[in-house]
Amino acid sequence: MGLNYPVDLEAWHAWQQRQNTLRWVKGRAQNMVRARRGAQQGMVSGVLYTRGAIPRVLIVLDSFSPTSRNALLEPLKHLEGVGVALWCPSDASAYLNGQYASTRYSRKDWNAAPIRADELAEKLPGVRLVLSLGHYLPRGHAAYRFARERGIAYWVVQHGLLVPHAPPLPIGSTLLAFSDEDAQFWASGRRDVQTHTVGSQLLYRAIQNTHGETTKSLGKILFLGQMHGAELPRASFARAAHSFLKRHDGIYRPHPSETDKLSRATHALWEIEGIAIDRSTTPLNEVPNPVVSVFSTGVLEAAIRGIPAWVYHPNPPAWLEEFWARYGMNRWGEDPTPAPEQPAVEPAHTIAQLIIDYLEAY
């Protein structure tokens, strides 16, 4: 099994927009606005941060989400001797200190300036490698065009768990994957894509943060919401959660993205039926309750902490069963999901070393 759209990015975008009629209409309107705005203002822009005399690596962020920061900024700790440029959507100074800064560089060592996509070649003549999450978002796509036009390597870092609905990899790219199985899944038989297995920085850090200790499980089962997702129909996510919660007297924890009117109405209806809704802001990695979900990463994060965790769906499609097997997630009624094995070397360090090796061989 592999991707539904292993090569065609436009077909993937079209599928994504069609998943929800309201989302599709809204997306069409937003795209028209962006197109008009783009014609007036030029093209994709952002803030360019540079350190070192001549940047050799361009790291591209389309957001500052935790998964994006873990995948793309953590390697900075191990790239002290390499000139680096960061292309970000907005001010990133808060993320260029502390855990993402090395001992050699700190926030004050970065120069910042606004930049448009058509200025990349002029301002970054020494770049030999682009690192991103893929070419399916604006900056990642613009950086891919920049790389293709100049014959520059384009590397994609896996930042989340893979489903068949994931976007295709760019033609001629190099994938840095969580596992050999994920590399094979995302490449989907393509011969133009090279792969390296590096592990998940997010899960690696979760293991390090436990300090070898486990958390005592307390309280009712939390069902982790995913009604915002496009991988399954909203009704399928809702049916899985509702049937489980009514049967096992659990608590529903909405995903942070479940803020639309339909999601809020669903939460309110469930409360009338007697289903408890967790509206707290306590981070999931601090919650002691056992967890269940359809396929949330939170299942693996809970397992790492020693918290009992399972997956559940009353009628899972074949791809979901394959997903559960690939990530070692156990179904409700089986033993709790075991903590995933992690590499001996920090993934961010492995990524940095691969970059250094590539630049030295260039």
Language-model features, listed with the residues they occupy:
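C-terminal amphipathic helix plus adjacent low-complexity
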Residues: 1-13, 20, 325-362
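Catalytic donor nucleotide-activated moiety binding site of glycosyltransferases and closely related
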Residues: 90-101, 137, 246-278, 325
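Active-site and donor-binding regions of nucleotide-sugar-utilizing enzymes
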Residues: 2-10, 42-52, 58-201
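Conserved catalytic-core segment of nucleotide-activated headgroup transferases in glycan assembly
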Residues: 68-76, 198-268
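Short hydrophobic beta-strand segments
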Residues: 1-35, 46-66, 86, 130-132, ...
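Catalytic binding pocket for nucleotide-activated donors in carbohydrate/polymer assembly enzymes
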Residues: 172, 193, 197, 297-350
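Donor nucleotide-activated moiety binding/catalytic core segment of transferases
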Residues: 258-305, 309-310, 315-316
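Short acidic, S/G/P-rich loop/turn micro-motifs used as interaction or catalytic elements
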Residues: 63-68, 93, 136-139, 227-233, ...
